[in-house]
């Protein structure tokens, strides 16, 4: 199976394989088969639109985890100039599962922070599969407080299965680090915009997700636990993950309807990994619009708005 396609995309993968075969035949034999290729491309587009127009919550969860999906550093490359990565929490270590630093968005200085998964095996291990340890969250907190001092807006990119649950992380105060970030972010005197670009897993996501404006990409997820974890608790088997995903309401549109998400950013047909540059431009437009709005608020109004937003969660 083509690793660029998920199970439910197999019919699309089959059509793409036929198109590639025809291209090779045409190149080898100098045959003009452009009409047939064009017909198959139209068929592939229509099939993709049909499949992606009827995705289940579980299928969206799979897309959010797609190995080719753009990560934080990919978007930093597309969106920002003069990015200077900053390291270390000044307490214990540097955590590669969270990246952050100063950059410019259309010439204006910003602080960028986000989870970072890995592509290859070694990088995945080095970045702990995007699951931060306490030092990652403390690094993020240090950078956010720096942004406040220098009056820079904070832009965060969320993409994690969750905070690392290992013994070493617990020994170094994982829950305290997350809780401290929530406290600090609620009070920071600078605009904060968070964007969920893949998985938004529980407290590991929320620790850089307290904000004035929350965006989610169309095929991202945000939840208190993974569908597999929920299924294992409720049904005693991870095989019930599709049912759990539906019941939990983890998708961008569901969360927008609940008032948790402010903006759902549409993805290119087939997902962000099909056209990362186009996806980045859509994100750029939203960030610039939202920054202009937030920077136009008085500081007291900004903080009151943020507080009211937090207090509204879970209210009838």
From Swiss-Prot:
Cellular component terms per the entry's GO annotation: acetyl-CoA carboxylase complex
Gene Ontology molecular function: acetyl-CoA carboxylase activity; ATP binding; carboxyl- or carbamoyltransferase activity
PROSITE patterns noted in UniProt: COA_CT_CTER
InterPro entries the record matches: Acetyl_CoA_COase_a_su, ClpP/crotonase-like_dom_sf, COA_CT_C
Keyword Ribonucleoprotein: no
Pfam families for this protein: ACCA
Keyword Transcription: no
Cell location: Cytoplasm
Catalytic activity of the protein: N(6)-carboxybiotinyl-L-lysyl-[protein] + acetyl-CoA = N(6)-biotinyl-L-lysyl-[protein] + malonyl-CoA
Annotated pathway: Lipid metabolism; malonyl-CoA biosynthesis; malonyl-CoA from acetyl-CoA: step 1/1
A Gene Ontology biological process term: fatty acid biosynthetic process
Principal cellular location given in the protein's record: cytoplasm
Quaternary structure note: Acetyl-CoA carboxylase is a heterohexamer composed of biotin carboxyl carrier protein (AccB), biotin carboxylase (AccC) and two subunits each of ACCase subunit alpha (AccA) and ACCase subunit beta (AccD).
UniProt protein name: Acetyl-coenzyme A carboxylase carboxyl transferase subunit alpha
Gene source species: Pseudomonas aeruginosa (strain LESB58)
């Amino acid at each position: 199976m083509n690793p660029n396609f998920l199970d439910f995309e197999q019919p699309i993968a089959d059509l793409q394989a036929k198109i590639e075969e025809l291209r090779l035949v045409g190149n080898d034999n100098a045959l003009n088969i452009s009409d047939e290729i064009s017909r198959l491309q139209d068929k592939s587009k229509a099939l993709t639109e049909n499949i992606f127009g009827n995705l289940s919550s579980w299928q969206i969860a799979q897309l959010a985890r797609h190995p080719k999906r753009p990560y934080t550093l990919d978007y930093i490359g597309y969106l920002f100039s003069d990015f200077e990565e900053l390291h270390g929490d000044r307490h214990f270590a540097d955590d590669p599962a969270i990246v952050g630093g100063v950059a410019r968005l259309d010439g204006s200085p910003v602080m960028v922070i986000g989870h970072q998964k890995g592509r290859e095996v070694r990088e995945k291990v080095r970045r702990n599969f995007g699951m931060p340890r306490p030092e990652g969250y403390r690094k993020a907190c240090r950078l956010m407080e720096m942004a406040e001092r220098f009056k820079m807006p904070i832009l965060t990119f969320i993409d994690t299965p969750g905070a690392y649950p290992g013994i070493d992380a617990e020994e170094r105060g994982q829950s305290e680090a997350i809780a401290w970030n929530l406290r600090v972010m609620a009070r920071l005197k600078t605009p904060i915009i968070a964007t969920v670009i893949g998985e938004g897993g529980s407290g590991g996501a929320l620790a850089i997700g307290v904000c004035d404006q929350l965006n989610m990409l169309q095929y991202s997820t945000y939840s208190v636990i993974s569908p597999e974890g929920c299924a294992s608790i409720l049904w005693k088997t991870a095989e019930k993950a599709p049912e759990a995903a539906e019941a939990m309401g983890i998708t961008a549109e569901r969360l927008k309807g609940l008032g948790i998400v402010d903006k759902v950013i549409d993805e290119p047909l087939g997902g962000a990994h099909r056209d990362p540059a186009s996806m980045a431009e859509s994100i750029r437009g939203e960030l610039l619009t939202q920054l202009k709005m937030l920077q136009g608020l008085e500081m007291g109004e900004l903080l009151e708005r943020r507080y009211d937003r937090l207090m509204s969660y879970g209210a009838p």
